[in-house]
Amino acid sequence: MTSYLTVYDESAVKALCTTRANETKAWQSMALLDTQVNVQQALIDAAQFGIRYVLLGICEDIGPRANLGNKGAQHAWPAFLKRFLNQPHNQFIATQKVLLLGEVNTTDLMLQSNQLSAKQPEQLTQLRELCRQLDERVEAVLSLIFKAGLEPIVIGGGHNNCLGIIRALSKHSQNPINAINLDPHADFRPCEGRHSGNGFTYAYNEQHLNSYHVIGLHELKNNQATLDAMAQANHSFTSYQAIAVRREITLSSAVTHALNGTDNYALGIEVDLDSITYMPVSAYNCSGFSVADAEHFVHVAASNRRAKYLHLCEAAPDQHPNGLDIGAEHAGQVLSALTNSYLQAKEQ
């Protein structure tokens, strides 16, 4: 449903954009959707005119809060835009193939969620119901993008939004999909009501998820029930300790091996920003990967011909110890770097 989508026009992003003499910025080379045409048809037209990638934001922290986590993930998308739109456009990045679509409508759900506390059992149930409603909106919007043959780069919000993306791609391809996730957590908690910690569980139980591999799973940040559930579903992981502590395998080899072990279904690339050390996120991490490691993960995964989307989630700028403004600058830089890594890998 297009009512679940706010389509951006020039006025929506003008305040974020800067100019400089003798320099073309990314925003000056990117496309916006024709708002005079039906959204689905406009996306199809965009693909025919050479657009390949679609930027989509989700401004919510309902999922993380419904998972007993911290607030702030709603600020990741604007932080990304301010940075990405104003980077230079040059021979190394194909921003002319990128469409800035807009954002999933979350305002009404966020207003309701702001009145709720996860510490109260009844209100926690309500938060999880709002998360379920958000799933429907994400799926509806992503379905439009996949139907047009375009590749979404989805930014902001919690990891709960993986479910809507996976549902949409699975239904479009008429097959379950494979997913590879850079994350200290498996996000394979029980189906106890929707939140950011069980999107992959729901996707698997609904038969939308075929093979699921977690890169960088922290051996001491996942409970035994989650590890048992992963094993029972024949999903797999390469732990943070195996890669970074015991050095049993390199990050490159871990990603390549995981992808070689899957069949020919569509592939989703997931990055939980919790995986990166000192990121302002909903679950702060002092022992994670570097930004360069995360960029490399995206590069290797996106180089796979079956990769169909990139999902960057859980950045929460206002969790930065120096406040929202510094956190937005930090998150914006990292989200832009990961997006650039995807685009460059796809165009190599």
What are these regions (language model features)?
Residues 2-153, 161-162, 171-174, 229-348:
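Catalytic cores of soluble, metal-dependent hydrolases
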Residues 136-137, 142, 146-215, 222, ...:
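Active-site histidine-anchored catalytic micro-motif
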Residues 188, 220-221, 244-247:
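Short, small-residue-enriched loops and turns at beta-alpha junctions
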Residues 194-196, 217-222, 249-253, 290:
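A general structural motif
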Residues 220-231:
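Short, glycine/polar-rich helix-capping loops at beta-to-alpha or helix-loop-helix junctions
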